[in-house]
């Protein structure tokens, strides 16, 4: 089933990069989708649908495209930068795949099935307060009540959650950008490429080769030494896996764009066989049970769901997200000014 799901997803993704028969066939539905979503945006803009402003600044980091573009590492990098600048960020997320009846905090030992894989990864990577619930407003309000020292909210995804007012919007793309430029389902876009945003962040270090606008910034993901899933204290530089041939080394990824992970390993000098899995794959069963590989490399996002797998062949490849310093400086400066203003207004009341 995972292979069939990935093949279908890969087919759709390929079609979304061109304006062929698939896109033309679905284009009328895209017009309908655009009309409905556009009306909803306008209702919030005109005040017919109520939005809520929090007592602290809100930074939303998200996608206007379907599929993995690098949103989670961008959230980790920007939230960590805000904390390093002396601010006290809290992070809210939907908690994809979790059955949530109320806002819930993400703890170090939370389970991915209870809070979502991406929020758990964010919490472990940042050591900051992370709460999950589909209603971002209620989620953020609960976080602020539980962490009164928090003075900025970073919203993981939620660009289309207009009920939550935001001060800064950062839209993340990879090099595929908006694909064929069509809205769903004929293309990958949830909203038009022309939607308002404060900054565009492209998950590719060579973005300047094709984009030179001043409001476009880049991000890269630096691979770190791998650690063994069963024994995290055991670490190896990736170069030690270069001696393994394709049938001995397997790379697997259940993320939005598995090929990006595989390409980064090849760029590091490895030549693994590859096993793409559906995004948010739950690893209820061991997909590697019948694999003959000596070593299996997986992503950090997948690792938070694989703790129960008793397989010493599995190694986790961490990444360190590095965002353009200019964007980090701009966001920190604006958030600090907004936070100071919020504090002054609260003191005057």
Curated annotation (Swiss-Prot):
The keyword Lipid metabolism applies. GO terms for biological process: lipid A biosynthetic process; lipopolysaccharide core region biosynthetic process. Keywords: ATP-binding, Kinase, Lipid A biosynthesis, Lipid biosynthesis, Lipid metabolism, Nucleotide-binding, Transferase. It catalyses: a lipid A disaccharide + ATP = a lipid IVA + ADP + H(+). GO terms for cellular component: plasma membrane. It holds the Pfam family LpxK. The keyword ATP-binding applies. Its EC number is 2.7.1.130. ATP binds at residues 65-72. Pathway: Glycolipid biosynthesis; lipid IV(A) biosynthesis; lipid IV(A) from (3R)-3-hydroxytetradecanoyl-[acyl-carrier-protein] and UDP-N-acetyl-alpha-D-glucosamine: step 6/6. GO terms for molecular function: ATP binding; tetraacyldisaccharide 4'-kinase activity. Disulfide bonds: none annotated. Coiled coil: none annotated. PANTHER family: TETRAACYLDISACCHARIDE 4'-KINASE, TETRAACYLDISACCHARIDE 4'-KINASE, MITOCHONDRIAL-RELATED. Transfers the gamma-phosphate of ATP to the 4'-position of a tetraacyldisaccharide 1-phosphate intermediate (termed DS-1-P) to form tetraacyldisaccharide 1,4'-bis-phosphate (lipid IVA). Belongs to the LpxK family. This is Tetraacyldisaccharide 4'-kinase. It comes from Ralstonia nicotianae (strain ATCC BAA-1114 / GMI1000).
């Amino acid at each position: 089933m995972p292979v069939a799901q990935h093949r279908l997803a890969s087919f759709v993704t390929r079609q979304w990069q061109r304006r062929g028969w698939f896109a033309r066939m679905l284009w009328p539905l895209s017009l309908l989708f655009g009309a409905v979503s556009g009306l909803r945006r306008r209702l919030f803009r005109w005040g017919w649908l109520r939005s809520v402003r929090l007592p602290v600044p809100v930074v939303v980091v998200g996608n206007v495209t379907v599929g993995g573009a690098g949103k989670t590492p961008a959230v980790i990098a920007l939230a960590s930068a805000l904390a390093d600048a002396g601010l006290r960020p809290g992070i809210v997320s939907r908690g994809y795949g979790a059955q949530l009846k109320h806002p819930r905090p993400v703890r170090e030992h939370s389970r991915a099935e209870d809070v979502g894989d991406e929020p758990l990864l964010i919490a472990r990577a940042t050591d900051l307060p992370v709460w999950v619930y589909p209603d971002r407003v209620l989620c953020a309000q609960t976080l602020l009540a539980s962490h009164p020292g928090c003075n900025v909210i970073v919203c993981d995804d939620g660009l289309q959650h207009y009920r939550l007012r935001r001060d800064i919007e950062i839209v993340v793309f990879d090099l595929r950008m908006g694909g064929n430029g069509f809205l769903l389902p004929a293309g990958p876009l949830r909203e038009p490429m022309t939607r308002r945003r404060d900054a565009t962040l492209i998950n590719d270090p060579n973005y300047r080769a094709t984009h030179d606008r001043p409001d476009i910034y880049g991000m890269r993901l630096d691979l770190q030494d791998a650690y063994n899933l069963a024994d995290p204290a055991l670490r190896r530089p990736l170069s030690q896996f270069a001696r393994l041939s394709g049938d001995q080394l397997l790379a697997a990824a259940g993320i939005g764009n598995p090929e990006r992970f595989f390409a980064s390993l090849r760029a590091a000098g490895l030549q693994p066989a590859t096993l793409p899995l559906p995004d948010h794959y739950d690893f209820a069963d061991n997909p590697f049970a019948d694999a003959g590989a000596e070593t299996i490399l997986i992503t950090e996002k997948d690792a938070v769901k694989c703790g129960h797998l008793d397989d010493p062949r599995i190694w986790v490849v961490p990444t360190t997200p590095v965002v353009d310093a200019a964007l980090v400086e701009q966001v920190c400066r604006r958030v600090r000014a907004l936070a100071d203003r919020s504090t002054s207004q609260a003191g005057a009341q």
